[in-house]
Design a protein with these regions (language model features):
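Compositionally biased terminal segments of proteins
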Residues: 1-176
């Protein structure tokens, strides 16, 4: 009898491996969630990788093919489906492979088309990864009622405030 297999927490090496697979397939995706925060230097504990994907049939085939190549091949079950999100009330697919990948066509009501406009191409260990920018992360996090997302939103507001240029001072009124 074989040993039961369990999903382990995702590591940065897994993010890089996933990005390589998605890039090789030409998939349109954006890294969101905890690892997107970490890519910007805002580290908090996370155990899965969250990606948003363009929800069209061609791209669905591309990201499914990429994820089907993960060690346990769990995503292969989705091969051949033009719309793997059909009928999914939460509009998220959780791929519990060697590590967990949550795949979403939108995040907190924000469409992939909008998320893609807020993606920055970051080169991480030689791999280009489209990562949701700080403002995009804030926009999605503050839509959530989960305590960890509210904490992330507070951290993002602080980071954005620190990165903003100092406000311009208005000229002093000479009183005349």
């Amino acid at each position: 009898m074989s040993e039961p297999r369990f999903t382990r927490p995702a590591l940065w090496e897994d993010v890089l491996d996933l990005a390589r697979r998605l890039n090789r397939q030409g998939a349109r995706y954006v890294l969101v969630g905890g690892y997107a925060l970490a890519a910007h230097g805002l580290v908090r504990m996370t155990t899965d990788i969250d990606i948003a994907v363009a929800p069209d049939p061609d791209n669905n085939r591309r990201w499914v093919a990429a994820l089907a190549g993960l060690p346990d091949g769990v995503a292969a079950e989705l091969a051949g489906e033009d719309d793997p999100f059909a009928g999914d009330l939460l509009h998220a697919i959780r791929i519990n492979d060697e590590f967990t990948v949550d795949v979403m066509p939108s995040v907190a009501g924000v469409s992939f088309a909008i998320l893609e406009q807020h993606a920055e191409q970051l080169l991480i260990d030689g791999e280009p990864i489209p990562v949701l920018d700080l403002q995009g992360l804030l926009d999605t996090k503050q839509q959530s009622e989960r305590p960890k997302d509210q904490a992330d939103a507070a951290l993002l507001r602080e980071a954005l405030a620190r990165l903003s240029p100092a406000p311009l001072l208005s000229p002093l009124d000479s009183g005349s």
